[in-house]
């Protein structure tokens, strides 16, 4: 969706006309001029993270370095993203086209407030992630297979199926 549609009244400058929302939590800022090494990106209200560098950003305009072949993508705080990654857990690396299994199922967690439901069609189960800023914890229910939980930011506790797996 276009930024003007997703955030009416916030984005009025044509400078950001190529930015768009991919779902509710990912903001994509394509580089349309290959001669530029820096681009201006507008991030709507809230906290954001760079998908590929995990840098933290506040809302507003930011000048971002953009190397050839890179696509700036930003993730809204409070998002949980599932990835099928290779053995080195590299984002964007080749994992094949298999749809009946996962190489290394990884959930990248950007702590915030909310509930995220994920249905595992391979193992026929639903997994619920609850993220709370009040208690500063992540609670995962229904997980039946080994996964990697990659935390971007800090929380006091991560609890999976009732068992604490991480705490400060």
Specify the residue positions occupied by each region the protein language model found.
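Catalytic core of carbohydrate-active enzymes
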Residues: 1-154
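Short strand-turn-strand beta-turns centered on an Asx-Gly dipeptide
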Residues: 44, 160-163
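Beta-strand-rich ligand-recognition modules
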Residues: 164-168
């Amino acid at each position: 969706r276009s930024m003007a549609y997703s955030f009416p009244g916030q984005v009025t400058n044509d400078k950001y006309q190529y930015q768009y929302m991919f779902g509710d939590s990912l903001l994509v800022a394509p580089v349309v001029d290959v001669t530029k090494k820096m681009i201006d990106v507008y991030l709507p209200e809230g906290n954001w993270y760079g998908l590929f560098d995990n840098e933290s950003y506040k809302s507003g305009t930011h000048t971002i370095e953009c190397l050839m072949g890179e696509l700036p993508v930003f993730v809204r705080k409070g998002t949980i993203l599932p990835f099928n990654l290779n053995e080195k857990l590299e984002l964007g690396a080749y994992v094949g086209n298999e749809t009946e299994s996962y190489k290394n199922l990884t959930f990248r967690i950007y702590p915030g407030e909310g509930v995220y439901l994920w249905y595992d069609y391979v193992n026929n189960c639903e997994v619920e992630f609850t993220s709370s800023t009040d208690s500063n914890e992540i609670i995962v229910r229904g997980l039946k297979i080994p996964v990697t939980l990659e935390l971007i930011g800090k929380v006091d506790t991560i609890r999976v199926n009732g068992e604490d797996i991480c705490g400060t």
